[in-house]
Design a protein with these regions (language model features):
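Non-catalytic, membrane-anchoring transmembrane segments at the edges
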Residues: 1-173
Length: 173
C-alpha cells in the first residue's frame, strides 16, 4: 500500500518487495567497494536484482532503467521540490507522483513484454517518449543546476568583495 501513497520513484522502490530490498541493501549496496559513486552502487544492486529475476531482456530494461530515473528524480528534487512549501509543494508533490507512475509504467512494460523485439516494437510505437523526455529533463536539469551554482558563486564573490571593500574603507578612515 505504501507504494501507491509515496510521492517519489525512490520511495516507491523502497516500499516494493521490502524483504528482497532489505537483502539487496545489506548484501550488495552497503558492501559495494566504492561508497563515492552512488549511481554505481545503485546500478550494481539493481543489476543483481535483474539477474535474480532471470535472463530476459525486459528484466534488464526495466530494472536497469531505474538508477537513471532515480538520479533524474534526485536532481529535480534538489532543484524544485526540496525547498518548496505550502500549495507549491503540494503541486510539485502531485507532479512527482504522476511522473513516478509514468516511470513505473514505462519501465514495467519492458518487464512484461520480456523479449527485445517486443520491447523495441512497443517503445517505437510510442516514439521512445519516456527515454526522450528523461534525456531532455536530465539535460535541462544539468543546465539549471549549473546556472544555480554559477549564481551562488557570483553571490559569494560579491559578498566576499563587499567585505573586502568594507575592510579597506575602515582602514582608510
Amino acid at each position: 500500500m505504501e507504494v501507491e501513497r509515496c510521492w517519489t520513484f525512490r520511495e516507491g522502490m523502497k516500499h516494493w518487495n521490502v524483504c528482497v530490498q532489505y537483502w539487496l541493501a545489506v548484501n550488495v549496496y552497503k558492501l559495494f567497494p566504492s561508497k563515492k559513486y552512488r549511481v554505481g552502487r545503485t546500478g550494481a544492486t539493481l543489476l543483481c536484482s535483474a539477474y535474480w529475476h532471470g535472463f530476459r531482456p525486459g528484466h534488464y530494461f526495466c530494472i536497469m532503467g531505474a538508477p537513471f530515473y532515480v538520479s533524474l528524480e534526485d536532481m529535480w528534487n534538489k532543484l524544485v521540490r526540496k525547498d518548496a512549501t505550502g500549495p507549491v509543494r503540494t503541486v510539485i508533490d502531485v507532479l512527482f507522483w504522476i511522473f513516478k507512475w509514468f516511470a513505473f509504467s514505462y519501465l514495467g512494460v519492458a518487464f512484461l513484454l520480456s523479449s527485445f523485439g517486443n520491447i523495441w516494437r512497443f517503445y517505437s510505437s510510442v516514439y521512445h517518449i519516456g527515454y526522450i523526455c528523461w534525456a531532455a529533463m536530465m539535460g535541462l536539469g544539468f543546465i539549471l543546476t549549473n546556472q544555480r551554482k554559477a549564481a551562488e558563486r557570483r553571490r559569494q564573490k560579491r559578498a566576499a568583495g563587499g567585505d573586502t571593500a568594507a575592510v579597506e574603507e575602515k582602514k582608510a578612515q
